[in-house]
From Swiss-Prot:
<dbReference type="GO" id="GO:0000785">
    <property type="term" value="C:chromatin"/>
</dbReference>
<keyword id="KW-0808">Transferase</keyword>
<dbReference type="Pfam" id="PF00856">
    <property type="entry name" value="SET"/>
</dbReference>
<dbReference type="GO" id="GO:0010629">
    <property type="term" value="P:negative regulation of gene expression"/>
</dbReference>
<comment type="similarity">
    <text>Belongs to the class V-like SAM-binding methyltransferase superfamily.</text>
</comment>
<dbReference type="InterPro" id="IPR046341">
    <property type="entry name" value="SET_dom_sf"/>
</dbReference>
<dbReference type="GO" id="GO:0008757">
    <property type="term" value="F:S-adenosylmethionine-dependent methyltransferase activity"/>
</dbReference>
<dbReference type="InterPro" id="IPR053010">
    <property type="entry name" value="SET_SmydA-8"/>
</dbReference>
<dbReference type="GO" id="GO:0042826">
    <property type="term" value="F:histone deacetylase binding"/>
</dbReference>
<keyword id="KW-0489">Methyltransferase</keyword>
<dbReference type="GO" id="GO:0016279">
    <property type="term" value="F:protein-lysine N-methyltransferase activity"/>
</dbReference>
<keyword id="KW-0949">S-adenosyl-L-methionine</keyword>
<dbReference type="GO" id="GO:0005634">
    <property type="term" value="C:nucleus"/>
</dbReference>
<dbReference type="InterPro" id="IPR001214">
    <property type="entry name" value="SET_dom"/>
</dbReference>
<protein>
    <recommendedName>
        <fullName>SET domain-containing protein SmydA-8, isoform A</fullName>
        <ecNumber>2.1.1.-</ecNumber>
    </recommendedName>
</protein>
<feature type="domain" description="SET">
    <location>
        <begin position="55"/>
        <end position="287"/>
    </location>
</feature>
<dbReference type="GO" id="GO:0032259">
    <property type="term" value="P:methylation"/>
</dbReference>
Length: 462
């Protein structure tokens, strides 16, 4: 992700220095103004045996944002563009993701789950003594974790979050050069991540200016470029935080011409979703493809710090999918209301039937109501209850095209095909098949081609 990708950090405490936004931005720029040619050389080394003899892609300057990936020849839909191993992985440190070993990702027991060498990281007994864990274990022990003498065993998400950055310090020279060459957004909120991590240790080197500058930039690179990649181990699935540099260089498009997926958290696979002409920029998406225009652009503005200018963002019907649509609030009208201006974050909304215009504040409350109502059901209902809710109750307050309701249908599909192992009635299976066809029809209208979501829904990839 050239100008953005997963979240941002700011200048750490200790050592003083200029903390103006201009200074932060200069500090986070790619190392020594790395040229696309130099970046390509670093990527070649990183790819190793996965680099094709005659790749169908190249790295070049982009009019979208800085640098991008471009087709060196015509690429057919479905064709492999590249595969890439993660440069570094680590835990997401999200609630619900704290009970896996940071090395092998097996589920940990309820007691005795911290490293036996007292680094306070969640590591299984086998991995505690592994070479893979040794350097980071010594690193954390040198900083003297405050939780080491705690009466009750617990995983500290703040110190766990910084682990991926610590692993970057232990990469090889050329790998570190690649990290330095990557974009890192300047964001003051990053400072909190580092300060919160520092407060977990008695001997965190906050006064070491060189170290703190390096850490700040590494955290910036990770928050700007890292992906969350699912990894299955020992019969359960966890999310890893992985840095895939080439995948991250691809720029954003709301309905991209390429799609990516991950194999067990450590391998990214990128394929063409549509035909890509020679010289065309190869794009990915930084958002969910089925989110509505307004939701996507709020997410991009808040987390990636840019506004998208793609064709889809200029079409308030989104190719006739009406993913953002809500019901009209005018008495007696059941028409669809959609945002009038798709390029603003607080647009007026207009009914396409009665043409009444409603202020954003009113429609935002309506959308929030639908979002919260549906999400609460997703988090608490059985599959059978969700089907009843989607079919009988949702039509009273939410159009069938609204992206939140589409997410609910996807939730049922995932639970019935990927996670649940119970038997379902033919009627329940019929509802799931109908949801699948509805989602596939929306993807077709969007022109999403052979995207990852389509392949997941149809079972082409797991």
């Amino acid at each position: 992700m050239s100008t953005a990708a997963q979240c941002p950090p700011p200048r750490p405490g200790g050592g003083g220095g200029d903390t103006t936004l201009a200074a932060l931005s200069a500090h986070m720029a790619p190392c020594r103004d790395t040229t696309p040619e130099q970046l390509a050389q670093l990527i070649d080394v990183h790819l190793g045996d996965l680099r094709q003899e005659q790749p169908n892609w190249t790295i070049s300057s982009s009019t979208v944002a800085g640098r991008g990936v471009f087709a060196t020849r015509d690429i057919a839909a479905g064709e492999l563009i590249f595969q890439e191993r993660a440069l570094v992985t680590g835990p997401t440190a999200r609630k619900g993701q704290l009970s896996s070993c940071i090395c092998c990702h097996e589920t940990l027991p309820q007691t005795g789950f911290l490293c036996r060498h007292r680094c306070t990281l969640p590591v299984c007994e086998t991995c505690s003594d592994s070479e893979e864990h040794q350097a980071e274990c010594e690193h954390f022990r040198r900083w003297q974790p405050k939780d080491v003498d705690a009466e009750q065993e617990q995983v500290n998400p703040m110190s766990l979050r910084i682990l991926t950055a610590v692993r970057v310090f232990h990469l090889g020279k050329e790998q570190r050069h690649l990290v330095d060459a990557m974009q890192a957004n300047a964001e003051r909120a990053y400072r909190r991540e580092i300060i919160q991590a520092a407060q977990c240790f008695r001997n965190f080197p906050t006064t070491d200016r060189v170290f703190m500058d390096q850490l700040f930039r590494i955290v910036g690179v990770l928050n700007t470029n890292a992906f969350e990649a699912p990894c299955r181990s020992g019969g359960h699935e966890t999310l890893l935080r992985g840095l895939f540099p080439l995948t991250a260089i691809m720029n954003h498009e709301c309905t991209p011409n390429a799609s990516h997926y991950f194999e067990n958290g450590r391998l990214a696979v990128v394929r063409a979703a549509r035909d890509i002409p020679k010289g065309g920029e190869i794009t990915t998406t930084y958002t969910k493809i089925l989110w509505g225009n307004l939701t996507r652009n709020i997410f991009l503005k808040m987390t990636k710090h840019f506004a998208c200018d793609c064709v889809r963002c200029h079409d308030n019907t989104e190719n006739g999918t009406y993913l953002s649509a809500l019901f009209c609030r005018e008495q007696g009208c059941r028409g669809l209301v959609i945002p009038v201006q798709t390029r603003t974050l607080q647009p007026d909304w207009r009914c396409i039937t009665c043409e009444n215009v409603f202020p954003h504040a009113k429609m935002a409350k309506y959308q929030d109501f639908a979002l919260n109502t549906i999400n609460n059901r997703i988090n608490s209902c059985s599959v059978q209850d969700m089907i009843h809710f989607i079919n009988e109750l949702c039509p009273r307050f939410c159009p069938s095209s609204n992206y939140v309701l589409i997410e609910a249908k996807l939730n049922v599909i995932w639970r019935m095909t990927r996670f649940d192992h119970e038997e379902y009635t033919p009627e329940e299976m019929g509802h799931m098949d109908r949801y699948r066809e509805e989602v596939l029809a929306i993807l077709h209208k969007l022109g999403a081609g052979e995207c990852t979501l389509k392949k997941l829904i149809t079972g082409e990839i797991q």
